């Protein structure tokens, strides 16, 4: 799985600077109640400052040069006869599992070489009383913190660029078209390309303009059926906080979505800030996000990949939810679990998804809770694995959630067929935090009490007890004072 930021398609920092590509022809428009939560009495500790990066003895290549070089190589790989692309049998095998995989779909088999916990890991974990709060300047145990000094001019860290290299090679091995071919298709429809944004595993994204649109637009060109699936979903949706589909073109088997261009994705927006957002701005972002989630759930749709990279923003009062490539339709009742399968991003997946259990629309509530947490803290991601090539599989992610939140054994689902309960309940045996009280991670972050309450309710461990988006919108944060 690529790093979370790889699928960022709206961030202006990471895009390649290139001259506008003139249009060739004129296009034809195809169509114009959960558990009670008890806050503890102790106050939250201030978030420690970012760590100072260690000096390097070697001068690495420019990040902008690496990004441009990567895009140029991708554009030449299929067209250069000296470097033919051979079919990768392992890629074919992956295609048999999920032929139309969207961006950042979690593939557990890719982590076969990851070191799992030892055999005695099913025993008790360290209890809440055994965790010593870190001194000032240290990071909380196991929680990733982004340092502004690690982010280069392109908006990517060195680890993220390495992940992009691997993901781009994987996309080509699965039969993806190079950016040069995709650019010709886009300009052939009358668009002028002003820049190529970070390529994704299912297609290319271009910053474009067209005489039919008064402002810049984003053209997302994808070769997998997941792009067509996303187009069908977007055509059904009409909500101010959901990314609208302006137009749709299908050329040579490639589906091109025309979307409005926002200033940045929420991940990039938060990374650029020096300080966290205020309570009114956090409430505005949270209200719009939960309103969009409530709307799609009432339409019988589960997004399954809600994260800051898939939320686009002009201002905190103007955001929208996008990237529906991993979405699916509800089967049966919204409250009845169904085995939809794993999809989305491991770091933001709900525990029941990671365990392979049937699930409901409340998996989106868990992911939305993580987004609201990042919006409030702005420089850290809860439950995220350390960066680098060795990122833990689903098993390690569940263990990380249990450890960092100090999940109590009584907070697991009582359902006898729950894999999450049968396989992982024993790992919470040593956790001493009383059930349904403030999770352990709240000790390390200072948040408005109403924001903290909202996040904790959204991150209810048992999906059956997790509140709906409509219920969360009734919490004190959204009530006028």
UniProtKB/Swiss-Prot annotation:
Positions bound to ATP: 197-205, 220
Active site as annotated: 305 (proton acceptor)
Effect on the protein upon substituting residue 220 to M: Abolishes kinase activity
Transmembrane region(s): none
EC number: 2.7.11.1
Gene Ontology molecular function: ATP binding; protein sequestering activity; protein serine kinase activity; protein serine/threonine kinase activity
Biological process, per Gene Ontology: negative regulation of protein import into nucleus; negative regulation of protein localization to nucleus; symbiont-mediated perturbation of host apoptosis; symbiont-mediated perturbation of host chromatin organization; symbiont-mediated suppression of cytoplasmic pattern recognition receptor signaling pathway; symbiont-mediated suppression of host cytoplasmic pattern recognition receptor signaling pathway via inhibition of RIG-I activity; symbiont-mediated suppression of host NF-kappaB cascade; symbiont-mediated suppression of host T-cell mediated immune response
Xref: CDD domains: PKc
Reaction catalysis annotation: L-seryl-[protein] + ATP = O-phospho-L-seryl-[protein] + ADP + H(+); L-threonyl-[protein] + ATP = O-phospho-L-threonyl-[protein] + ADP + H(+)
Record GO cellular component, one term: viral tegument
Pfam families: Pkinase
Stored InterPro entries: Kinase-like_dom_sf, NEK_Ser/Thr_kinase, Prot_kinase_dom, Ser/Thr_kinase_AS
Positions of region (Disordered): 12-63
SMART domains the UniProt entry points to: S_TKc
Entry's localization field: Host cytoplasm; Host nucleus
Record domain Protein kinase: where: 191-478
Main location: host cell
Modifications after synthesis and translation: Phosphorylated by UL13; this phosphorylation regulates subsequent phosphorylation of UL31 and UL34 by US3. Autophosphorylated.
Keywords: ATP-binding, Host cytoplasm, Host nucleus, Host-virus interaction, Kinase, Modulation of host cell apoptosis by virus, Modulation of host chromatin by virus, Nucleotide-binding, Phosphoprotein, Serine/threonine-protein kinase, Transferase
Subunit structure: Interacts with host LAT; this interaction prevents LAT activation of TRAF6.
Function: Multifunctional serine/threonine kinase that plays a role in several processes including egress of virus particles from the nucleus, modulation of the actin cytoskeleton and inhibition of host immune response. Phosphorylates UL31 and UL34, two critical regulators of capsid budding from nucleus to endoplasmic reticulum, thereby facilitating virion egress. Modulates and redistributes host components of the nuclear envelope, including LMNA, emerin/EMD and the nuclear matrix protein MATR3. In turn, facilitates nuclear pore impairment and capsid release through impaired nuclear envelope.
PANTHER family named among the record's database cross-references: KINASE, PUTATIVE-RELATED (PTHR43671:SF103), SERINE/THREONINE-PROTEIN KINASE NEK (PTHR43671)
UniProt record similarity statement: Belongs to the protein kinase superfamily. Ser/Thr protein kinase family.
Protein name in UniProt: Serine/threonine-protein kinase US3
Species: Human herpesvirus 1 (strain 17) (HHV-1)
């Amino acid at each position: 799985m690529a790093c979370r930021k790889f699928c960022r398609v709206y961030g202006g920092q990471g895009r390649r600077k290139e001259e506008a590509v003139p249009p060739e022809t004129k296009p034809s428009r195809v169509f114009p109640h959960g558990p009670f939560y008890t806050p503890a009495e102790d106050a939250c500790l201030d978030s420690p400052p970012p760590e100072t990066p260690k000096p390097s003895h070697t001068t690495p290549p420019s990040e902008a040069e690496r990004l441009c070089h990567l895009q140029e190589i991708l554009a030449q790989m299929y067209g250069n006869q000296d470097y033919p692309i051979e079919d990768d049998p392992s890629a074919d095998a992956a295609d048999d599992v999920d032929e139309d995989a969207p961006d950042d779909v979690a593939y557990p088999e890719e982590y076969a070489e990851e070191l799992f916990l030892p055999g005695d890991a099913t025993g008790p974990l360290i209890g809440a009383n055994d965790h010593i709060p870190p001194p000032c300047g240290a990071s909380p145990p196991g929680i990733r913190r982004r340092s502004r000094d690690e982010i280069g001019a392109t908006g990517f860290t060195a680890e993220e660029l390495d992940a992009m290299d691997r993901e781009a090679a994987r996309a080509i091995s699965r039969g993806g078209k190079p950016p040069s071919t995709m650019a010709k298709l886009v300009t052939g429809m009358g668009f002028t390309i002003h820049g190529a944004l970070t390529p994704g595993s299912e297609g290319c994204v271009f910053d474009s303009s067209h005489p039919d649109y008064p402002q810049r637009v984003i053209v997302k060109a994808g070769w997998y059926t997941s792009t067509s699936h996303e187009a069908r979903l977007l055509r059904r949706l009409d909500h101010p906080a959901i990314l609208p589909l302006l137009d749709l073109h299908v050329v040579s088997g490639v589906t091109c979505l025309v979307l409005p261009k926002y200033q940045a994705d929420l991940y990039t927006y938060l990374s650029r800030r020096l300080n966290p957002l205020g309570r009114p701005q956090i409430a505005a972002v949270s209200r719009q996000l939960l309103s969009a989630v409530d709307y799609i759930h009432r339409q019988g749709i589960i997004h399954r990949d809600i994260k800051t990279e898939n939320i686009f923003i002009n201002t905190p009062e103007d955001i929208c939810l996008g990237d529906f490539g991993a979405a699916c339709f509800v089967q049966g009742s919204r409250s009845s679990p169904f085995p939809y399968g794993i999809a989305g991003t491991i770091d933001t997946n709900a525990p029941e998804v990671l365990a392979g259990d049937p699930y409901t629309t409340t998996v989106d509530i868990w992911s939305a809770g993580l987004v609201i947490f990042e919006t409030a803290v702005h420089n850290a991601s809860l439950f995220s694995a350390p960066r680098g090539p060795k990122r833990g599989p689903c098993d390690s992610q569940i263990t990380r959630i249990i450890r960092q939140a100090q999940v109590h054994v009584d907070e697991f689902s009582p359902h006898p067929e729950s894999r999450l309960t049968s396989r992982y309940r024993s790992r919470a045996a040593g956790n001493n935090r009383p059930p349904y009280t403030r999770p352990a991670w709240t000790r390390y972050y200072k948040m408005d009490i109403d924001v903290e309450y909202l996040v904790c309710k959204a991150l209810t461990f048992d999906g059956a007890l997790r509140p709906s988006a409509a219920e969360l919108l009734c919490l004190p944060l959204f009530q006028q004072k």
